[in-house]
Amino acid sequence: MSKRDGREVDPDRLYLLSSTSQGYAWLLKLFCDPGDYVLTPRPGYPMVDQLAMLEAVEVDNYFLSWDGAWLTDVGQLRQHLQTSTPSALVVINPNNPTGSYLRPDERAGMVQLCHDFSVPLIADEVFFDYALSNVFRERLAGEERVLTFALDGLSKNLAAPHAKVAWLEVSGPDELVRQAQEKLDQIADAYLPMSDLITAQLPSLLDAIGSQIETVRDRLRKNLQRLRSCVAASRTGVMDLYEPEGGWSALLRFPAWIDEDELVTSLIRDAAISAQPGYFFDMPTAGFLSISLLLQPEVMAAAAESVIARIDTAVEATLF
């Protein structure tokens, strides 16, 4: 991590976990009593909501809006914090499913808000190294101005769902870190997620990250270009691709009157293609599909053509 980020990472501030989900669960235990709430992004991955529910913790949202890029209204977030203080602020960098990285002003604004209102910052950065463009990006891991908990893991870095090892880095003002680690150590001691069987394999797995990320990122970028081409070739021209800046998926926008469930189930039934409907992620409106970019290139090309053709056919059926 020190080599990757170009900074000194203190191993005493690192926790090994069985998964990032476990990291979330630990942090919810650390900061929340039953009935407390955390702030999470919307659109966003539903896993955080599910984990919060299991800890009897509520979830409220701050919002990303699309204006040619996904943007966070930091001013609106400040207004929220002025009326109610969450137990923690969750940031997904880059976001899933939007694929948007925090912009410099957003990053600075969120750090300042956490400082002003004494709110811990939870940064989920599992997709950080899968940049699909040359957009500015900066990790929150290692942030020193506010109490920060950065999550990352092998399963995303290796694109290997079975590689269930994750890590949590604590950073921030020394006294706040000390107080948090006293309690976090107790939680870690209660769960003991690691064993010698797992840690013995870590060096070789960590060594493989660089080349694996490069291989996967190359596929993601090529598949994104294939999807762009298919959208551009649409017979009806009613679809838009909301360009991701990073991550493993892309959002396809289509007319909202096309039922997402019907579209997804018909793709599974008739073409053996699986995509995720937008409402899985609390998209602001109907008419979205989240499409994986991880497929083998030849599979991706055929699948993208089938999805676009299916939507074109639905639109044409209403016009003629």
Residue ranges and their predicted role:
Residues 142-221:
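Conserved core segment of the aminotransferase class I/II
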Residues 1-37, 257-261:
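Phosphate-binding glycine-rich loop
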Residues 40, 61, 123, 275-277:
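Hydrophobic residues in well-ordered beta-strands that form the structural core
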Residues 68-137:
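Active-site phosphate-binding strand-loop segment of PLP-dependent enzymes
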Residues 203, 218-228, 240-253, 285:
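Conserved glycine-rich beta-strand-loop-beta hairpin in the small C-terminal domain of fold type I
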Residues 79, 266-275, 281-320:
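PLP-dependent enzyme catalytic core of the Aspartate aminotransferase-like
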Residues 55, 84, 116-117, 271, ...:
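Helix C-cap/helix->beta junction micro-motif
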Residues 29-91, 104:
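PLP-dependent aminotransferase-like
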